[in-house]
Amino acid sequence: YLNGKFEYMSEESRQRIADGIEELGYRPNALARSLKSKQSFVLGVIVSDITSPFSPILLKGISDCCDRFGYRILIANSDDEPRKERDYIMSMIDQSVDGIILNTTGGNDEFLRETADTGMKFVLADRTIDMDLFDTIHSADRDAIEQMMRYLKGAGYESVGYFTQPLTNSTRISRCQVFREIYSDYFNGTAQVYFLEKRQRDANVMQEYMRRNIDCKHAIFSGNGVSTMRIVQTMRDLNIEFPKETGLCGFDDWEWMNLVGGGLTTIDLPTYEVGKECVKRMMHLLHYARTGAPRTLELPCTLQIRQST
């Protein structure tokens, strides 16, 4: 009963044990449980940027699903620094976590391969690595970009500029690459990509975009929620109105985005579900024999159409 194996128990027996546990106030001893099974029933979770609204949503999905399986989580934030990521992985191994769910910074592919060779289980959340080594759960970004481009074309836009932070991780790289690849399927000319690097130069980037597209109906497509925040701040500083002067849309559907103007058109990512699926995948790795190649699961996104476009 305490291990959740009910298949050989009658409903009457289950209820009798449950009543006894409640009456006695029994609480399982996690240490004794781990010593017997040689498992800690703890998963390590490393996120790349704890300040991003993406991370708490991901962690909520992971935590809720871990509760269901009787696991606890140990959380660390790598600050998008590969060295910190390596240090936290080693620290979690020293603390005997059963597996690690990793929202990776990138730049640690060989280290991860060597660590996995020692037996540590990894599941990648949202971001991938170059080597096909680990099960990965992320959003179906290509389909989402296709949906957004079709919508913008249908709404009468003639040109779209893609705004992104520097391409330092797999998600930014893949989204930008897809945008470039499919742009000509919907619009004339070459794909326009604008990089938001130093905050003090955002106004220059925005002005360049506005000058380049002065003669057509145009829209900005933001690569993630952090970029969208910087774009909105810059447009406010330059007194640029959306959708009057340019349309605005992008990845991530954070709560504040519905409060700006008449709301921003967004791609609502299944971040909570990504967290849950990472845990389910980890449970499979820990409790069932591995067969076949690592698997990648893409979860569908939802377009939220609002007044910014």
Give a label for each model feature.
Residues 1-39:
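N-terminal helix-turn-helix DNA-binding module of bacterial transcription factors
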Residues 16, 54-68, 144-148, 170-189, ...:
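Short, solvent-exposed amphipathic alpha-helices that sit
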Residues 80, 102-150, 168, 226, ...:
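Flexible loop/hinge segments that line or gate small-molecule binding clefts
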Residues 135-162, 177-181, 200-210, 228, ...:
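Hydrophobic alpha-helical segments within soluble ligand-binding/sensing domains
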Residues 207-309:
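Flexible loop/turn connectors
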